[in-house]
Amino acid sequence: YSFVFLRPLGLRLIQITLAARLEKFNLSSLAALTATDELNLPSLGEKKVALFALIPDNDTSFNFLVSILYTQLFQQLFYLADYKYGGSLPVPVHFLMDEFRNVSLPEDFSKILAVMRSRNVYVSIILQNVAALKALFEKEWESILGNCDEFLYLGGNETSTHKLISESYLGKSTIDTNTYGKSSGRNGNYSTNYQISGRELLTPDEVRMLDNRYALLFIRGERPVMDEKYDILKHPNIHRTEDGGA
C-alpha cells in the first residue's frame, strides 16, 4: 500500500479518516450482520424474491447500510444481466425507494437510472416534493425526472412542485368564449364575438387545492389522468397486514 510511505503526519491523517469511516463496524451486531453474505444478491434477478430494508425515519445513523445495499445490488444485477443473460435479467427487479431523501445513493445514480430499464431493472422514487429532489441532485434533478416514464402526484403543499406540474406536465387547455352585446334605441343592434383562448389545464393554485381523494398520473406519450386513489383497506389481502388486523 503506497500510503505507508507518506510522512507520519499524512499517514496519521489517513488512519484517523479510515477509522472514523469504519467506526460503526466495530459494533458486534453490525459486524455480525456484514461478516458473511447471506443475501445472494444476484438471485433477485433470477427468481421472485421480496427483500425489505427497513430504516427509521427519525434516525439516519445506519442509513449507510442501505446505501451499500443499493450500490451492490445495482452492480451485481447489471453484471448478471450483461454477462450471463445477454443484457436483460430473466426476472424483472423493481426497487421501491421510499425515504429516498434519507438514503445516500451512488454518485452516478442519474446514469444508473438512464440505463437500468434495458436490463429489466426498475425503480420507483418516492419523495415528499420536487424540492427534495432538487436538494439531492442540484444539477441533475431534471435529468432524473426525464428518465422516469411515470409521475404520480398524490398531493402536497410545496410551491415549486405545484408550478412544475401545472406548467411542465399538464400544459394548456383551449377555452371557447362567446361574447354577446346588445344596444337599444332607434338604431339598436346585436353583436356576437367568438374567441378562442388558452389557459393552464390546472393552475398551480388548483394543483395545490387538489381534492385528497384524487391523484394526478402522467405517463410518457399519454394524456394526464386524474383518478381516485385506491383505498388500500379494500384490498382483498388487507387482512394479512397489520392495518387489516393481522
Protein language model annotation of sequence segments:
Residues 113-216:
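Conserved ATP-driven motor cores of ASCE-family P-loop NTPases powering translocation/secretion/packaging/pilus
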Residues 1-121, 136, 197, 205-229, ...:
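P-loop NTPase motor domains
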